[in-house]
Every structure is written in C-alpha cells, then in structure tokens.
Amino acid sequence: MPRSWTDIVAEKRAIRDEKLTKCYGENVPSDPRIIAAKDIQALTKLLEARNVTAEAVVLAHIAKAKEAHQRTNCLTEICFDEALEHARELDAFQQEHGRLKGPLHGVPVSLKDQFNLKGLDSTLGYVGRAFHPAASDCVLVKVLKQLGAVILAKTNLPQCILWGETDNPLWGLTTHPMNPEYTPGGSSGGEGTLLALNGSMLGWGTDIGGSIRVPSHMNGLWGFKPSSGRFSYEAVAVSQDGQQQIPSVVGPMARTLSTITLASKAMIEAECWRLDPQLPPMPWRKDVFQEYLQKPLVIGIMVDDGTVKVHPPIERVFKEFCKKLEAAGHELVPWDTSLNADCIKIMDEHYIADGGEDIRRDMAAGGEPYMPHVQNLVDRGSAISVYEYWQLNKRKKATQAAYNTMWNATKSSSGKPVDVLLVPTMPHTAIPHRTLRYPGYTKLFNMLDYSALSFPAGTALKALDSVCTGEYEPRNAADAWNWSLYDIEKMDGYSVGLQIVGRRMEEEKVLGAAHQVQQLL
C-alpha cells in the first residue's frame, strides 16, 4: 500500500530536525571576527593570516544557520557533518601547501533546494520527489567545491518553485526575519532569510520571474540575475524542465556587492562551459567591468511600469537615489514603458503552454494538496499545440527585437546611448503571507533575458511615507490589490530594493555600474 503524503512529510522533517539538534559546540563562543567579516575578501584575509581556520568559520556559520532556521524555517537538507569534514580538508591543504585552495576557500555557501547535491533530495517542494537523492553533484556545486567553497545546507522554496513566496506542504512556510506574519519573498526565500541572518556568506538561487531579486529586495540583500548561459544550470532540478523559451537562470545572493562580484568572476573564470555544453565559452571581460566601474553613466529610469504603481516608500527611495545619481554626474533618461505589458503577457503564456501538465504530474506522484497559487496556475488554461507554441515564440522574438530597437533609439540630452536601467524591484516592501500578486518589475527582464541586479537602496520610513493613498485611482485589478496592501505602520523599517539592468550578456557592465552606484548608498 502506498504511503500517505503526510507520512512522507513527517519522515523528511524528522530527518532534517534530527540533524539540526546535533550539537556542534554552539556553547563555545566563536571568534567574533568570523561573523563580523562583511564579505569574502575580509574572510579570506583572516584565513590567509591564519587568524581563523576554515573549521572555525564553518562552525560559527552552522550556529547561525541553526538560529536562522529556528526563527524562519528556512532549511530543507542539512549537510553540516560533510561541511565540517570539507573544512578540515581545507585546513590540512593550507597547512601542507602554505596557501588557500581557491578564491572561495572556506566560504560557507548555501543552495536553494533545486541544486543537486550528491546523496540529498532536490524536491522543489514536491512530496513525490522526496527520498530520491541525487546521484552526483550538479556542475555548479562541483565547481564551487573546486574553488574551496563549503556547502552548509539547502534552503526552502515554494511548491513547484514558480512563485514569489516560500511555502509548500513538504517543508512548510518560511517567514520573514523581521516578522513571522510576513513573507521573505520567493522563490529563493529560504536563501533570503538564511543570508539575512548570517547563516551563510554566499547563497545560490534561481530566477525565472524574480526569484533571486524579490527575496533580496525583501531581506536587504544583493541578488544577481544573469542572462541565461553565464552560469551553469546543468543538473539543477526545475519545474517545467524543457521549457527553454523563458529560461530559469542561476545567480548569487549575498549581503555585499563585493561578494556577488567575486563569486560571479570566480565562477566565470572556472570555465564551466567545459563541463556544461549549454554554456557559451565567454570569459570574464575585465575591460568591460573596469570601464563601467569608472565612466559616467547614462541611466534609463522607470519608477512606474505603466501597470502597477509602486508604494510611496519605493517611489521616495527611487527619486532620492536619482537625485544622488545626477549630483554625481550621471545622466538620467526617462524610460518608455509601452512594451512592458506585452512582455509580461507573452511570458505568462509560456508559463501555461502545457496546460499545467508538468506540475500535475509532480503533484500526482506525491498526492499532497495544491497550494492556492499552484492551483491557480494550472487552472489558467489548456495546453496549446506545437504550431501555436511556435507562434508564441515568434511573438516573443519580435517583442525582444522591438525592445532592443527602443533601447538603441533612446539617447540622453547630450546624445549618448543608455548604459543601464534603474527600476524598482517590487511595487511594495515585504508584505503578509499569501498576498503577493504582481512581480512585473522583475518578470519583464526574464522575458528579455537581461542581466539584472537588485540592491538595497533604502527603507520604508513612517515619518516620510505616511501619505494618503485614498486619492489614487487604481488603473486595474492588480494595481488596486497592490494599493490595498499599503500600511506604512506595519511596513516601517522594511528594506526597499532597486534594480540595475543591462542587456543580454552584460553581466560585467551591470556589476561595474553597480560598484559606482554603491558609492552613493
């Protein structure tokens, strides 16, 4: 007789919880310099000087990870024992060779549940995928280990992944570090909370509609969505596997831009295309990074996407930051939003092209109930024919071409082309669970396959953002819903993220420009 889905859930959680109850010396104070190290560079200096060991670094972060999980329910698969063993191997390597193994030597890393890690499940929040451990590491994990990184744990995500919050029947609800009644975002929400609470130094998530950038925005982090093909997706489990027209991408999340940049550069310089034939052999372009690290920028600005107006704190932070950019000598250009709605519509049609069959099959394998957002997704429409899919792809290509033409035609008052865009990450800050409905500000750039970095630009402040919202007349149902969520009394102090956006394969440009932007924060 098949086991009930509730029995499987109970067993999976019991295995995780048993690993979390094991003592790793939490009663012994760790070196305060470890957690105080703000980024990889600072940690590397401590390790190189032998002020701390990799083992001590991992132990300190295990303690923080356990605290973060107790507070937010962010972890799924635990590999603390393996992490400590790896850390001791790194210490032995340094003792023998007198140097660190690689640019990520001893860096505690966490992974969204999707990434295959040998011996552990990649469930995607599906009960039916429990107790089917990966036979080998995915390419990204193999390379991370070669670079010296230490994998601590895997983190929670929503059922079927495709949502901006983090909840599923298998692992349960992940909550915001500041308020258990609020969502940390998603779908890389477990990463967002773990990083925000110092349980990891570098996280890796995935993004098909904002899944790296939304939790980064809500948790005060930096989150980088590259174009498809810069980082390996080989052996990373995903819903709707085979749907490649709107590709999910892998990207880093961290508390600092320097960590994002170092991790991105190290991963690209590792030449993962030798292990993953889907990647183009595109090396790190130092000259491009250096150029945009220094040159005055021309920035297209879009505070309103034309569909859903952002809340007052988002608008205030955006406009204040624009003033800083102009004062620093950068040129700002208003951005045309006329193609945005078409981009979102085409993207949504790709999500449901199979009529929900892929998700239904995974759900049938476990027998658990559908989360409301998943039920809504699979009920949205019937599968389309191959010919209809071809026509949809043609519309996508035509719209991408039109957007590119628009970008090329947009110039500053001095006649210079636009380098990057500045855009809100979301129309609101963190909000109550199960109320997120509109990630259009992030989805736009998945449809275009652009490079986009979300960064913490400010916070909602009751003293500055207590404005009357009743005077605004919403444009549509999504806009009305968004405005119904605004409550500055409850949103006071929550992070506000903005995005720097470049075109396809412009990762070095975006990161270089971001370092200029960071100086103004």
From Swiss-Prot:
Source organism of the structure: Gibberella moniliformis (strain M3125 / FGSC 7600) (Maize ear and stalk rot fungus)
Enzyme Commission identifier(s): 3.5.1.4
Gene3D superfamilies for the chain: Amidase signature (AS) domain
Active site residues according to the UniProt entry: K112, S187, S211
Task performed by this protein: Amidase; part of the Fusarium detoxification of benzoxazolinone cluster 1 (FDB1) involved in the degradation of benzoxazolinones produced by the host plant. Maize, wheat, and rye produce the 2 benzoxazinone phytoanticipins 2,4-dihy-droxy-7-methoxy-1,4-benzoxazin-3-one (DIMBOA) and 2,4-dihydroxy-1,4-benzoxazin-3-one (DIBOA) that, due to their inherent instability once released, spontaneously degrade to the more stable corresponding benzoxazolinones, 6-methoxy-2-benzoxazolinone (MBOA) and 2-benzoxazolinone (BOA), respectively.
Induction statement: Expression is induced in response to 2-benzoxasolinone (BOA) exposure.
Sorted UniProt keywords: Hydrolase
Family: Belongs to the amidase family.
Top-level EC class: hydrolase
Misc remark: Fusarium verticillioides possesses 2 unlinked loci, FDB1 and FDB2, necessary for detoxification of antimicrobial compounds produced by maize, including 2-benzoxazolinone (BOA). The FDB2 cluster arose as a duplication of the FDB1 cluster with rearrangement and expansion by incorporating additional genes.
Disulfides per UniProt: none
Catalytic activity: a monocarboxylic acid amide + H2O = a monocarboxylate + NH4(+)
Domain of life, per lineage: Eukaryota
Record flagged with keyword Hydrolase: yes
UniProt name for this protein: Amidase 1
Binding, substrate: S187, I208, G209, G210, S211
Pathway this chain belongs to: Xenobiotic degradation
InterPro entries associated with the record: Amidase_CS, Amidase_dom, AS_sf
A Gene Ontology molecular function term of the record: hydrolase activity
Effect of disrupting the coding gene: Does not affect 2-benzoxazolinone (BOA) degradation.
